[in-house]
């Protein structure tokens, strides 16, 4: 990890730079080719790309009820219990987000209100890669089920034997997924965006993935389907003072670094002593990790930053807009109130980022790459739309009609004015 001591504000942009992405032109062209082929050839193209990229030959894309039942038997009892606990907490937290619309009378005779309606068809993408992300199944399917989405479709790449990880299937069944398909990468995004003979077309796609999946989601979102948010490599920042435990801080930094070689971990602290202790602890704990090679590469683009005071630490944090922010300071609740840009915040020394990743109840699908300045993480709202309604009676049209006529006339929209005028003549 690179150490930076008392950075000047003019250098912040460079210091906070994320790891470089792949060449966008090459990426865009490769992704477009796959999207176009799946759009025109359907299942056939998906199976061809599965054979090419995932090294598996599939007779069909759908996961059967028999496969789901078999998978349930393969999941260890202790893992089932952990998944059930996590799902319960996620369900509890997201259920509390239900929207209760109320009718508002803006003036006598004019009533307005909103109604929350579920997105009917949603698609969930669950990556394969180096680890089975069954936790992401819970994070996406649970709020979709609470929202009342009628069709919850899940795509995930199979292994070379054509099987989906048992824990993914178990979590999917528990959280209410309707249909599961063996498809990964760009071809999975294309299948859900356009529909194939097997995979239904959905209205919105959720889920993380590599740079190809991210690019595919962005391309299909231009015309064909909505997506959850722009996504990039995972990241964490720990904001700490001299009271923080260096063992905890190092563990939190490494828990993010092991996600992938392009992940980023940052420490911003007011304590030089803590920075040195964390630097030592990171190296000590790194050697003990099973995924140490991945974490080590990630640490190459990670930083330990010493600042002059907490005001500077907060300003630097809000500029970085981290996906995950852990605050380990003496007055962490007070400092938390000053945070305006972050995906999810973890408060105090006993609140690791891992808790939000799995079982505290909050969602771990969060904005990365600085998008926390403008985007929220996934929540119940991500799976609903709010439709507005208005009702106007005779008194109401008399109260607002003349103003509408004046405004429409001044915008030179005569038909708009007339739609009010003909009504005013009848009341």
Task: Map each language-model feature to its residues.
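Conserved NAD(P)+-binding/catalytic subdomain of aldehyde/semialdehyde dehydrogenases
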Residues: 176-264
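C-terminal core of ALDH-fold dehydrogenases
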Residues: 319-427
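Short acidic-hydrophobic, aromatic-tinged amphipathic segments that line or gate anion-handling sites
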Residues: 2-7, 179-184, 304-309
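Conserved small-residue-rich beta-alpha loop and adjacent elements
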Residues: 104-170
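A glycine- and small/hydrophobic-rich beta-loop-beta segment
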Residues: 259, 267-342
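N-terminal Rossmann-like NAD(P)+-binding subdomain of aldehyde/semialdehyde dehydrogenases
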Residues: 1-120
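Flexible, glycine/charged-enriched surface loops at secondary-structure junctions
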Residues: 99-104, 226, 263-268, 288-298, ...
């Amino acid at each position: 990890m690179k150490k930076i001591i008392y950075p000047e504000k003019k250098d912040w942009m460079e210091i906070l730079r994320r790891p470089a992405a792949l060449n966008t032109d090459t990426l865009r062209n490769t992704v477009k080719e796959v999207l176009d082929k799946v759009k025109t050839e359907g299942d056939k193209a998906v199976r061809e790309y599965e054979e090419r990229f995932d090294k598996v030959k599939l007779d069909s894309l759908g996961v059967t009820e028999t496969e789901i039942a078999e998978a349930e038997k393969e999941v260890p009892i202790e893992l089932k219990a952990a998944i059930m606990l996590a799902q319960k907490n996620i369900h509890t937290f997201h259920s509390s987000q239900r929207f209760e619309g109320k009718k508002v009378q803006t003036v006598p005779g004019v009533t307005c209100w909103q109604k929350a309606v579920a997105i009917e068809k949603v698609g969930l993408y669950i990556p394969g890669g180096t680890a089975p992300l069954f936790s992401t199944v819970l994070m996406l399917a649970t709020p979709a089920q609470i929202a009342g989405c009628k069709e919850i479709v899940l795509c995930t790449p199979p292994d070379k034997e054509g099987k989906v990880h048992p824990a993914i299937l178990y979590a999917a069944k528990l959280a209410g997924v309707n249909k599961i398909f063996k498809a990964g990468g760009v071809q999975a995004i294309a299948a859900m965006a356009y529909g194939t003979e097997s995979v239904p077309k959905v209205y919105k796609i959720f889920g993380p993935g590599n740079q190809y999946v991210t690019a595919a989601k962005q391309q299909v979102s231009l015309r064909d389907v909505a997506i959850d948010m722009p996504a990039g490599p995972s990241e964490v920042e720990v904001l700490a003072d001299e009271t923080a435990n260096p063992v905890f801080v190092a563990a939190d930094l490494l828990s993010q670094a092991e996600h992938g070689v392009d992940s980023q971990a940052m420490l911003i602290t007011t304590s030089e002593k803590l920075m040195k202790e964390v630097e030592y602890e990171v190296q000590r704990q790194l050697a003990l990790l099973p995924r140490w090679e991945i974490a080590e590469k990630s640490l190459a683009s990670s930083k330990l930053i010493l600042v002059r005071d907490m005001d500077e630490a907060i300003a630097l944090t809000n500029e970085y807009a981290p996906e995950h922010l852990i605050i380990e300071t003496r007055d962490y609740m007070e400092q938390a109130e000053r945070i305006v840009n972050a995906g999810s915040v973890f408060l105090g020394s006993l609140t690791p980022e891992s808790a939000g990743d799995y079982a505290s109840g909050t969602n771990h699908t969060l904005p990365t790459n600085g998008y926390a300045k403008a985007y929220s993480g996934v929540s119940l709202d991500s799976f609903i739309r709010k439709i507005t309604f208005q009702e106007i009676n005779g008194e109401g049209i008399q109260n607002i009609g003349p103003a509408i006529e004046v405004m429409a006339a001044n915008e030179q929209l005569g038909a708009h004015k007339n739609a009010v005028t003909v009504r005013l003549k009848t009341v």
